[in-house]
Regions:
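Short loop/turn microsegments at loop-to-beta-strand junctions
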Residues: 4-5, 44, 99
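Recognition helices and adjacent regulatory flanks at domain boundaries
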Residues: 14-16, 21-24, 51-55, 59, ...
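Short connector loops at helix/strand junctions that flank enzyme active sites
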Residues: 2, 10, 29-34, 61, ...
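Active-site-adjacent beta-strand/loop module that shapes the phosphate/pyrophosphate-binding cleft
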Residues: 11, 60, 70-92, 102, ...
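The catalytic Nudix box helix
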Residues: 34-67
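Conserved N-terminal beta-strand and adjoining loop/helix that marks the start
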Residues: 1-17, 35-38
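Nudix hydrolase/Nudix homology domain
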Residues: 25, 29, 94-133
C-alpha cells in the first residue's frame, strides 16, 4: 500500500483546499481536496509533508500536528493527516499544482458537492481539535 501525507491548513477559522487538476489519470480529479501526496521510499512523513507543501504552495509551516491515520482500501493507500496553521499572508502562498486554491469555512466545505467524503470527515475532526493546539 502507498503511504500518503495530507495537510489540513487553517487560518482565521478557514481551511485551505486545492481544486485538483481535471485529469482522468489522477485520483479524485476536479475535486476540492487537501494538499499533500505520496511518501517516497526512504522518506519520513514530516519530510514528505515538507516536500509536498513546498512543491504545491512554496511554503511549509513551522509546526505540524498529527491528527490521524486512515487506511483507504478504495485507493490502496494509508493516509496520514496533519494540521498546520498558516501564519503567512495568503498572497505568500503560490499554487504549484492543481487548478486553484481557496479558503473555506467549515460550513462552506459542507456545501461543496465535489469534495471527497474523507476530506470532509478529516476537516470536521480537525475543526474540533484546533482550539486545543
Amino acid at each position: 500500500m502507498r503511504e500518503v501525507v495530507k495537510a489540513i491548513i487553517y487560518k482565521d477559522q478557514k481551511y485551505l483546499l486545492q481544486l485538483r487538476d481535471n485529469k482522468p489519470s489522477i485520483l479524485c480529479p476536479n475535486t476540492w481536496a487537501l494538499f499533500g501526496g505520496d511518501v517516497k521510499n526512504g522518506e519520513g512523513f514530516v519530510e514528505a509533508m515538507k516536500r509536498e507543501l513546498t512543491e504545491e504552495l512554496s511554503w511549509f509551516p513551522e509546526k505540524l500536528f498529527y491528527l490521524a491515520k486512515y487506511k483507504d482500501s478504495k485507493f490502496d493507500c494509508i493516509n496520514t493527516y496533519y494540521i498546520a496553521h498558516c501564519e503567512v499572508p495568503e498572497h505568500a502562498l503560490v499554487l504549484g499544482e492543481g487548478q486553484a486554491m481557496e479558503w473555506f469555512t467549515i460550513d462552506d466545505v459542507m456545501k461543496l458537492t465535489n469534495t471527497p467524503d474523507m476530506v470532509v470527515l478529516m476537516l470536521k475532526k480537525a475543526h474540533k481539535h484546533i482550539n486545543n493546539i
